[in-house]
Amino acid sequence: MGLKKACLTVLCLIVFCFGIFYTFDRVNQGERNAVSLLKEKLFNEEGEPVNLIFCYTILQMKVAERIMAQHPGERFYVVLMSENRNEKYDYYFNQIKDKAERAYFFHLPYGLNKSFNFIPTMAELKVKSMLLPKVKRIYLASLEKVSIAAFLSTYPDAEIKTFDDGTGNLIQSSSYLGDEFSVNGTIKRNFARMMIGDWSIAKTRNASDEHYTIFKGLKNIMDDGRRKMTYLPLFDASELKTGDETGGTVRILLGSPDKEMKEISEKAAKNFKIQYVAPHPRQTYGLSGVTTLNSPYVIEDYILREIKKNPHTRYEIYTFFSGAALTMKDFPNVHVYALKPASLPEDYWLKPVYALFTQSGIPILTFDDKN
């Protein structure tokens, strides 16, 4: 134990000396500056405990914002970790940043598991976890992320609350049902163990005493009788005033972050006479033959605004496997369709997603993607 503490002390010194604390952080606009954390740890440790919320996607930030709204007056620190940084991520991060006491954006352009990135980032996370004031609750969706375990292992007595990360919470083959973190390489695995001890995915899952779900009426993998399940609707269309669909039809394809979907997406757009594509927040490629909707909003927020402006327009939303199909299917004047390429084998991994769509009343449209 003494050796472990000594190693951790040396690690802290290295982190300070080499500037991993981003004291003069320009790329992240000071969001990873630890000086304020250090000051609070030294001079205000007896203050009110804080709640931590970890996010990896825009959807998770939306859920986190709703959770925070349910606890007015409490202190919240938000930690966003992402390989992506674009207009959408910045917009929603700034939204939640305005509502949190502190917010940190860890932009990891090469991914955490890259050898040159893993050790310094895990070191930074562990040291910063120890600089936090007393932690009351920890909220997270991505149970499989070893980076969050750096904080969980530092505060084993904190309450753990989990929330949905899209359709991954509705599929039995989800990585959230695993036991151990996936860390490639012996050196990285050993370093991870030094940072998180015996913490695991299973330990996080079993410690969760409440789970927030955004999907009503669908079986959730976290609904196993061990915890309270709380429904948390994300998008409210109840106050929209709409009329008959006499204002024309707007067809929108939901983009995919996977580049191999480019050709199939273009064929689908042509086949169904789709005019627009709403890029996925992590999408880096464009599609020919359709107009790209450039907006800082995720598709649900975008459509709600469009319905308000054009209450007589019919909106047709086409998707291959986006969870947004489930969150938008009950919007007024919105008709959602799931696309299934004819070449897709019966045992393809998307089969459970299509089953979800069918269960939710979303039509499945098969098309010839080879011609």
Curated annotation (Swiss-Prot):
Keywords: Cell outer membrane, Glycosyltransferase, Lipopolysaccharide biosynthesis, Membrane, Transferase
Membrane topology: Peripheral membrane protein
Subunit organization: Homodimer.
Family statement: Belongs to the glycosyltransferase 52 family.
pH-dependence annotation: Optimum pH is 6.0.
Phenotype upon changing T242A: In strain: 406Y / NRCC 4030 and 126E / NRCC 4010
UniProt effect for mutating G168I: In strain: 126E / NRCC 4010
Consequence of changing S129A: In strain: 126E / NRCC 4010
Protein known as: N-acetyllactosaminide alpha-2,3-sialyltransferase
InterPro entries: Glyco_transf_52
Job description of the protein: Catalyzes the transfer of sialic acid from the substrate CMP-N-acetylneuraminate to the terminal galactose residue of the lacto-N-neotetraose branch of surface lipooligosaccharide (LOS), forming an alpha-2,3-sialyl linkage. Thus, functions in the sialylation of LOS, which plays a role in the evasion of the host immune response by protecting N.meningitidis from complement-mediated serum killing and from phagocytic killing by neutrophils.
Pathway the protein contributes to: Bacterial outer membrane biogenesis; lipooligosaccharide biosynthesis
Enzyme Commission number(s): 2.4.3.6
GO molecular function, a single term: N-acetyllactosaminide alpha-2,3-sialyltransferase activity
Localization of this protein: Cell outer membrane
Class of the enzyme per the UniProt entry, highest EC level: transferase
Additional information: Present in outer membrane vesicle formulations which are used as vaccines in human.
Source organism: Neisseria meningitidis serogroup B (strain ATCC BAA-335 / MC58)
GO cellular component: cell outer membrane
Binding site residues for CMP-N-acetyl-beta-neuraminate: G255, A278, P279, H280, P281, R282, I299, E300, S322, G323
Active site: D258 (proton acceptor), H280 (proton donor)
Effect caused by changing N94K: In strain: 406Y / NRCC 4030 and M982B / NRCC 4725
The reaction(s) this protein catalyses: a beta-D-galactosyl-(1->4)-N-acetyl-beta-D-glucosaminyl derivative + CMP-N-acetyl-beta-neuraminate = an N-acetyl-alpha-neuraminyl-(2->3)-beta-D-galactosyl-(1->4)-N-acetyl-beta-D-glucosaminyl derivative + CMP + H(+)
Source organism superkingdom: Bacteria
UniProt xrefs under Pfam families: Glyco_transf_52 (PF07922)
Protein's GO biological process: lipopolysaccharide biosynthetic process
